């Protein structure tokens, strides 16, 4: 079945809301944090059964082992042994981000194009690009992208779109927005010919231009998408992103879930959940964990700092995750990082992911109490 979305409580203080998304593979309480499992695995974490919704990257799975191979094995849920909801992207984000470089402060599309681009050609039909593994020439069109996501069998899928860097000129920016909506319509048509149990979110582009964001909202509202996803360039920093998210959500109807693509650090969640965002995806918690940044109820902990060398206190006294329940001290975890013990990143990742789930649980509670 396609997803069902219910608003359980609308805050009296803001546009924030508590909701529930029902899929064939389970229920997602919203607002929700969605960790990114790039290759079908959360880095540093083996057990993902307590993660309500997990984000997998079509591009990487298309390159290896191949989406047709995964389909032959029964789909992504069976392949990675997960009996809970999965969302996949179109593959476009990875293709364009590999070409245009890294992102800053989790705000997408701010960077300069690399000298050696993985993109060979962008046409109205799709994009030709080189595999990051072996340089093999590949083609991704709306239909190819959706078929790949059909092969994977994710519960929520995303239409193909073009991700532009922040510094694109106005003429190309406008033509890219137009091409993206043509691609999304083709993606939706292909999906609706064979919907299966899957749902598709329409992606809203428009950069930081309020009028273009309004046009993007009108496009997704006019088509039978099952949910909305805010994508494209969101500015160069948090201060630029907040008004973009505010004005975008103000143009959306309230009957469908809203996802903020690629944004999931704590400051961004806290700044935008009040606008009615229902889910956030990011690799931030596991990436931070691998670099020794521990998220805690007492604030972020840079565990490698000398201050923790003899600190036998628990990592987070209020946390009940496996790491904290194992009574690991801050001094011991610091030691593991200092000697480059692989377990360090594992313990930290387990904790950070649990912390994010607790943060979202608390946010839902605050919304129910009309505190957000």
From Swiss-Prot:
Binds 1 zinc ion per subunit. The active site is at 89 (proton acceptor), 281 (nucleophile). Zn(2+) binds at residues 319, 321, 324, 351. It catalyses: 7-aminomethyl-7-carbaguanine + guanosine(34) in tRNA = 7-aminomethyl-7-carbaguanosine(34) in tRNA + guanine. Its cofactor is Zn(2+). Its EC number is 2.4.2.29. SUPFAM superfamilies: tRNA-guanine transglycosylase. The keyword Glycosyltransferase applies. The keyword Zinc applies. Pfam families: TGT. Pathway: tRNA modification; tRNA-queuosine biosynthesis. Residues 262-268, 286-290 are annotated as: RNA binding. GO terms for molecular function: metal ion binding; tRNA-guanosine(34) queuine transglycosylase activity. One of its GO terms (biological process) is queuosine biosynthetic process. Keywords: Glycosyltransferase, Metal-binding, Queuosine biosynthesis, Transferase, tRNA processing, Zinc. HAMAP family: Q_tRNA_Tgt (MF_00168). Homodimer. Within each dimer, one monomer is responsible for RNA recognition and catalysis, while the other monomer binds to the replacement base PreQ1. NCBIfam families: Q_tRNA_tgt, tgt_general. Catalyzes the base-exchange of a guanine (G) residue with the queuine precursor 7-aminomethyl-7-deazaguanine (PreQ1) at position 34 (anticodon wobble position) in tRNAs with GU(N) anticodons (tRNA-Asp, -Asn, -His and -Tyr). Catalysis occurs through a double-displacement mechanism. The nucleophile active site attacks the C1' of nucleotide 34 to detach the guanine base from the RNA, forming a covalent enzyme-RNA intermediate. The proton acceptor active site deprotonates the incoming PreQ1, allowing a nucleophilic attack on the C1' of the ribose to form the product. Belongs to the queuine tRNA-ribosyltransferase family. This is Queuine tRNA-ribosyltransferase. It comes from Chlamydia felis (strain Fe/C-56) (Chlamydophila felis).
């Amino acid at each position: 079945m396609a997803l069902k979305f219910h608003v359980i409580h609308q805050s009296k203080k803001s546009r924030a809301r508590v909701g529930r998304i029902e899929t064939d593979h389970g229920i997602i309480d919203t607002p929700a944090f969605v960790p990114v499992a790039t290759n079908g695995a959360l880095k540093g974490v083996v057990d993902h059964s307590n993660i309500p919704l997990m984000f997998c990257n079509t591009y990487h799975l298309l390159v290896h082992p191949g989406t047709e191979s995964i389909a032959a094995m029964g789909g992504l849920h069976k392949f990675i042994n997960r009996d809970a909801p999965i969302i996949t992207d179109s593959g476009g984000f990875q293709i364009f981000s590999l070409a245009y470089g890294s992102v800053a402060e989790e705000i997408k599309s701010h960077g300069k194009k690399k000298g050696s681009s993985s993109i060979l050609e962008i046409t109205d039909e799709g994009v030709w690009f080189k595999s990051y593994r072996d340089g093999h020439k590949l083609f991704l069109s709306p239909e190819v992208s959706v078929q790949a996501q059909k092969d994977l069998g994710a519960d929520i899928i995303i239409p193909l779109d073009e991700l532009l860097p922040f510094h694109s000129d106005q003429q190309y920016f406008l033509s890219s927005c137009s091409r993206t909506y043509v691609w999304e319509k083709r993606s939706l048509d292909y999906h609706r010919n064979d919907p299966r149990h899957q749902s598709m979110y329409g992606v809203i582009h428009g950069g930081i231009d309020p009028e273009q964001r309004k046009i993007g909202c009108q496009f997704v509202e006019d088509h039978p998408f099952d949910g909305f996803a805010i994508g494209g360039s969101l500015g160069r920093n948090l201060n630029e992103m907040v008004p973009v998210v505010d004005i975008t959500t103000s143009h959306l109807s309230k009957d469908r879930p809203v996802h903020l693509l690629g944004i999931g650090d704590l400051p961004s969640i806290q700044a935008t959940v009040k606008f009615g965002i229902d889910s956030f995806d990011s690799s931030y918690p596991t990436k931070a964990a691998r670099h020794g940044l521990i998220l805690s109820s007492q604030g972020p902990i840079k565990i490698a700092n000398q201050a923790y060398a003899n600190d036998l206190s628990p990592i987070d006294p209020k946390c009940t995750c496996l790491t904290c329940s194992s009574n690991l001290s801050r001094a011991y975890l610091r030691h593991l990082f200092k000697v480059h013990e692989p377990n360090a990143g594992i313990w930290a990742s387990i904790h950070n992911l649990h912390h994010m789930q607790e943060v979202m649980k608390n946010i839902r509670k605050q919304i129910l109490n009309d505190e957000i």
